């Protein structure tokens, strides 16, 4: 099912950017793309994946995995925080990798087209 998405991305509590995009929700999997990245969110298993030309970042409840495509190299990155919430038509994902100074939070509001 196609969805209209409003996506707010925060670092700590500071809004970095806001996007209005189209996405697809099927079998509890939300997919969408912006100009540089594609995203897959498994709502049931609380998995967030972000992919671009250079890398794939996959965040699970217990760990984060970074794949460097050009080098065909996988790195497991310690995860200091992962919070995944779904309320009605809103998904909130917050994570802090050990290599980050500040946590990132992504709020996605979905509505039918």
Which functions belong to the PLM regions below?
Residues 1-13:
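Tryptophan-anchored aromatic micro-motifs
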Residues 6-9, 30-34, 48-50, 93-98:
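Short beta-strand segments that buttress and anchor functional surface loops
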Residues 17-18, 34-36, 92, 103-107:
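Short, surface-exposed coil-to-beta transition loops
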Residues 19-58:
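Short, well-structured hydrophobic secondary-structure segments
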Residues 22-24, 44-47, 61-64, 80-84, ...:
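A short, sequence-level motif marking secondary-structure junctions
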Residues 53-54, 58, 64-85, 102:
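Terminal, non-globular segments
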Residues 85, 90, 96-113:
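Mixed-charge, glycine-accented linear interaction segment located at domain edges/termini
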């Amino acid at each position: 099912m196609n969805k209209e998405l409003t996506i707010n991305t925060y670092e700590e509590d500071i809004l970095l950017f806001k996007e209005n995009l189209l996405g697809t929700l099927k079998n509890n999997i939300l997919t969408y793309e912006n100009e540089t990245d594609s995203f897959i969110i498994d709502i049931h298993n609380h998995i967030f994946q972000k992919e671009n030309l250079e890398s794939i970042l996959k965040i699970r409840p217990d760990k984060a995995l970074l794949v460097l495509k050009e080098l065909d190299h996988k790195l497991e990155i310690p995860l200091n925080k992962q919070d995944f919430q779904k309320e009605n038509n809103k998904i909130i994902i917050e994570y802090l990798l050990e290599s980050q100074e500040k946590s990132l939070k992504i709020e996605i509001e979905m509505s039918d087209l």
